[in-house]
Structure formats: C-alpha cells, structure tokens
Amino acid sequence: MTTTVTSSALIKIHGVSDIGKVRKLNEDKFSISNLSVKDSLNTYQGEVSKDGCLMLVCDGSGGDGRGEIAAKLAVDIFQKEIFTNEQEEIGIGARLINAANKANEVIWKCSKSNPSIAGMASTLTAALVVPPQVYIVEVGDSRCYLVRDGAITQVTRDQSMVQMLIDGGVITPHTAKIHPYRNIVLQSLGARVSVVPVITSLELAQKDRLLLCSDGLSKNLPEEKMLEIIVNQEDVVIASQQLIAAANDLIADDNVTAILAMIEGDAFAKAEKAATLLLSETADGDLSEELEDLTSELSLIDEDIIN
C-alpha cells in the first residue's frame, strides 16, 4: 500500500492603509486575494491554493482626488485581469505584465477622455505567491521587501529619479532622502500611453515574511525599524499595525500602506536550502529607452541641483 504525503503551503497576510496626519484623502489602495475563490480582502490566513494568493499596493497621484480614483482603478482592473485570464500556458510573469498593461491602458484612456481626472496616475506593486515561488510585478516606487533569517532585503528597485542617480554614482542613498528630485517617479500607471512592468521572482522559504508598502512607509520608516518590528512580532495583524503607527509617529506627511505576509508549510524550503534570493529579473521591454524623454528633460536642469 502506497501512502501519499501532501505538502502544505500556508500563508498569513494582513494589510493596513492609513491617511496619515496631513493628507485630506487616502490615495493609497491595496487588496489581498485568494485566487481559488477570487475574493478581495484586508486579511487572509490559510492554505495557498494552486492558483495562488495575490497581494497588491497602489499609490495614486494627480491631486484633487485624482490619485484616489487612479489607485482604485489600478487595483480593480489589475485584479480583474488576474481573475479572468488564467491562461497558464502564457506563464505567471506574462499574466502579471498583461494585467499591469491593461490597468495602464484603462487609466490612461480615462484620464485623456475626462478633463476632471486628467493627469491621474498610480504606482503598482503586486506579489503573486504560487508555492514555492513568489512573482512580483512593479510599476513605480511602491516596494516589496523580503525578511529572512533576521535580515531585510529590498526586492524591488524604485523606478525613480533618485534611484537612477544612485545607480549612476551621482548621489548616495543617504543623499536621496533629502534630494529635491526624491518625489519624481519615472513611470506610473496612466502617466503615459505605455509602461514597462518589471517582473522579479524568487523562491520562498519557511518563516519568510513579505512586506509590500507605499512610499509613505518606505520613505519615512528606516529599514532597521521595519525589521525590528517584523522579527519581534509574529502576528502579522499586530506587526502591520505597528509598522503604520511607527511611520506616522516619525513624519506622517503621506498616506501609509503596508501588507505583511508570513510564509509557512513544508511546500516551502528551509531557509538555508532556499535558492539564491533573486532567481530572475526581467522587463517587458527596455525601461531605460522608455524613460529617455523624461531623463533628457531633467538633464537640462542645473547640475548643482542634481548633485
């Protein structure tokens, strides 16, 4: 008689969004979904189905409530595309890219057809956990972090002006925090007719935590403080609330959103046996070429400002 051993894939996820102490509107939106039932939640604890669990954070911009509309559209359209287009043959990365492109198309067309919401846009960072992997798609500067073995790693790379200056050796990460270009995002959904979504995938391990957040958290709360909160509090509900509170205690000049997930179950490797952190990082197109127009305009600005 043969005994079949079934591996388990468990996840605990909780999301929190806060208006902060300065803004009049919350232009951040987020969602958590168990794809087997195609729901939209603030929290989920249970099995990760073969279809996976989806988390996404969107940070809207445009002023006068436009950002709130853009972020909601981004969440709704992206999620709908993932729910309704489950063609496994095209691959998970392609599904995420297609969904991001569709969200961009809808926001762009809405913005161009209605003067009252012209100029609206939104970032998007989404993570789809399909054991033992997580696939992350990014447009903009909302971040995804991995916490493993007492260390925190930024998985995504900000698509921002200061990140380009850091990559070019022009400024340091410390200088970027106070740089006059620190709020310039190089691409976002709805800002242009097309975007270049960036896909990253990695193998998850037991006890890993994933943190998705808007820049209201990442720009205001140091990574060492994020790590301290996450490793000292195993309850993802309490930890996510503590992250928001800590960011608000420091500056609170922006909306703040965080989704925190804990990975469990023997479907995931032991941490010491997990593969190299970044298994792949690809873009559907050349991001540097797509952003050439914007960066050439900025290059005309006084060099003293850049430095």
Language model features: what each stretch is:
Residues 1-307:
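PP2C/PPM-type serine/threonine phosphatase catalytic domain
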